[in-house]
From Swiss-Prot:
Keywords: ATP-binding, Cell inner membrane, Cell membrane, Membrane, Nucleotide-binding, Repeat, Translocase, Transport. One of its GO terms (molecular function) is ATP binding. This is Probable riboflavin import ATP-binding protein RfuB. It comes from Treponema pallidum (strain Nichols). Residues 46-299, 343-586 form the ABC transporter domain. ATP binds at G89, K90, N91, G92, A93, G94, K95, S96.
Length: 586
């Protein structure tokens, strides 16, 4: 259901427009092979060509020279102040790349970017901030040892031209923004001590402090669903419709893969597929042309389209004739108590001197079992993740007591909490997929080849051709049809998480710790992940899933046991299939 745009816009509204924007990335040689293969050619090139021949090129991408990878192609879009514009699409469609071009983090290969009719060239994010465009990243980066106040004012002197800052006035302004938006922040808090939700608000505070005209929200997952409604209402009240924003209202660009949220909060929706803007929808005209039943039917069918593995085109979105509803995931059979346990946590405690204390955490995971632990960052779920994956530092490591036991071939190993390392976990068959895949699970400067190889084919006897076939096979299994020699930064957040999971499963672990499994995944990727985890569990691998909010019914049905982490304590345990009353609240 595509409704054409009509009416005359007010001349006072700001316009941010893209004209024939395209972005391609050159192929990069793996770091370990650049010296020799740069002269004589890469011996694994045939494996890559075979993979492309077997599975076909990336759906929707334009054909380019073999030395390039196309991410965006001929994108034409316009964004206006005084409204919320949603960029909707599946993982890898090009939404985040488009947001990075708008915010100066990425330079387009060709095309023009115009602000109020004037061509703009953003070489660095500082240029975009000066023009009034700020971005709130999905995984923001801060000065960890600085306070919230210091992170907010950092760089303000270069942006405003004022070499000195009146602390009293700046503090008053920051306090006013925090109070107005009801942010759970304190200026004196150190960023290293903040949870993922609070770090999102710090990034938003940094953008609002610079009084932007456009705010870009890249996959905003600031809080559970009930709090997201409050956040978007504040966003529309205090920024989009506010008379204090530049030119009587600001513009918001939301990058998301959730059509229900986009239809609820955005005035305009653009569908990005295969690096192209293939469809456009004005939600303010739905009430005029459609009934409530038709709108609900539109939500269901577009959600099914985004969940479908096939390419979503404008005709498919407009007709909705060949789309079907999705089926829920089947429940994994309960684990027999006779199976040996793989992981046992006994009386794990983090004292009150740490950032978030934990009290008497005890549970065990048997082979083929799936344990789900749900809790907010304030309850300590991220601290538990750091301890289990051994990524904790500082007070959490110093004040941590208890036992973490691993059973392997009838031998029990007790991991030293103060001296444990990730390499020791891997030596005992433990694989980890962290919640922050960009900073903890990957290096964005590496190629996909370098990212996938190190934990499996790492011996000097393994030839490059075999390594390249291995990488191409992993990418093909995840339905990511791209060149293994392209940089990891060209992948979307959801694609990167799928690639890291494939890398960890390639090691054939006995225990898999997966944090925030549904973070940044669209419906199709989420269904694929559910099926993959079910197969892994049936093969004998024990799984521990850590999440900060309740997932849908199929996720709860996937777990053989579920725990709730509240105030640093496992206060509840639910087993079996969820009741109908629980499903109704999802």
């Amino acid at each position: 259901m595509m409704i054409a745009e009509r009416g005359v816009r007010a001349s006072a509204r700001g316009v941010l427009s893209l004209h024939h924007i395209g972005k391609t990335y050159p192929r990069v040689m793996p770091r370990s092979k650049r010296g020799v293969w740069g002269m004589f050619g890469h011996p694994g090139r045939r494996a890559v060509d075979d993979a492309h021949t077997a599975h076909g090129p990336c759906s929707g991408a334009r054909e380019t020279d073999a030395a390039e990878h196309s991410v965006l192609s001929d994108v034409n879009l316009s964004f206006f102040t005084g409204e919320i514009h949603a960029l909707l699409g599946k993982n890898g469609a090009g939404k985040s790349t488009l947001a990075h071009i708008l915010s100066g983090f990425c330079v387009p290969t060709h095309g023009q970017l115009r602000l109020d009719g004037k061509e703009q060239r953003f070489s660095v994010p500082f240029d975009a901030l000066r023009a009034g465009i700020g971005i709130v990243h999905q995984q923001p980066v801060f000065a960890e040892r600085a306070t919230v106040f210091e992170n907010v004012v950092m760089g303000s002197a270069a942006l405003t031209g004022v070499r000195w800052v009146r602390r009293a006035q700046v503090r008053e302004r920051i306090d006013r923004i925090i109070a107005q938006w009801r942010m759970p922040l304190k200026k004196e808090e150190y960023v290293a001590c903040l949870s993922a939700d609070k770090r999102f608000f710090v990034s938003l505070l940094c953008v609002l402090f610079r009084n932007p005209r456009f705010i870009i929200l890249d996959e905003p997952r600031c809080a559970p669903a009930q709090s997201r409604a409050v956040f978007f209402s504040h966003l529309e009240e205090f920024f989009v419709r506010s008379s204090h924003a530049p030119r009587c209202g600001g513009g918001v660009i939301v990058v998301t893969h959730r059509f229900a949220d986009a239809l609820r909060w955005a005035q305009r929706i653009s569908l990005i597929e295969g690096g192209k803007a293939c469809s456009f929808l004005r939600t303010d005209l739905l009430d005029e042309y459609c009934s409530a039943h038709q709108v609900n039917e539109c939500i269901q069918k577009v959600s099914c389209a985004l969940m479908s593995a096939s390419t979503v085109t404008s005709s498919a979105v407009s007709s909705f004739s060949s789309l079907s509803d999705t089926q829920s995931c089947a429940t994994v059979p309960r684990t027999s108590s006779a199976r040996p346990w793989v992981l046992r946590v006994e009386s794990l405690q983090v004292s009150k001197h740490a950032d978030v204390p934990l009290t008497d955490i005890s549970f065990s995971v048997a082979a083929s079992a799936i344990i789900g632990i749900v809790g907010t960052p304030e309850d300590g779920v991220h601290v538990l993740e750091d301890i289990l994956c051994d990524m904790h530092a500082g007070a959490s490591r110093t004040h941590c007591t208890g036992n973490i036991l691993l059973q392997e071939h009838d031998q029990v190993w007790c991991l030293p909490l103060q001296r444990n390392t990730p390499s020791l976990l891997r030596a005992h068959g433990v694989a980890c997929v962290p919640s922050n895949c960009i900073q903890r699970g990957a290096s964005m400067q590496l190629t996909l080849f370098d990212l996938l190889v190190p934990y499996t084919l790492r011996t000097w006897r393994t030839r490059v051709r075999a390594q390249m076939r291995f990488v191409a096979r992993l990418l093909a299994e995840e339905e990511i049809y791209c060149d293994p020699l392209q940089p990891a930064c060209t992948l979307s957040g959801g694609q990167l998480q799928r690639v890291i999971l494939a890398r960890e499963l390639a090691t054939r672990p006995r225990l898999l710790i997966l944090a925030e499994p549904a973070e940044g995944l669209d419906s199709a990727s989420e269904q694929r992940l559910l099926a993959r985890l079910r197969q892994v569990a049936q093969a004998g691998t024990a799984l521990v899933l850590l999440a900060r909010e309740q997932h849908q019914a199929q996720w709860r049905a996937l777990c053989t046991e579920r725990f709730l982490l509240r105030a640093g304590t496992l206060c509840a345990e639910v087993s079996g299939t969820p009741s109908p009353s629980q499903d109704s609240h999802t």
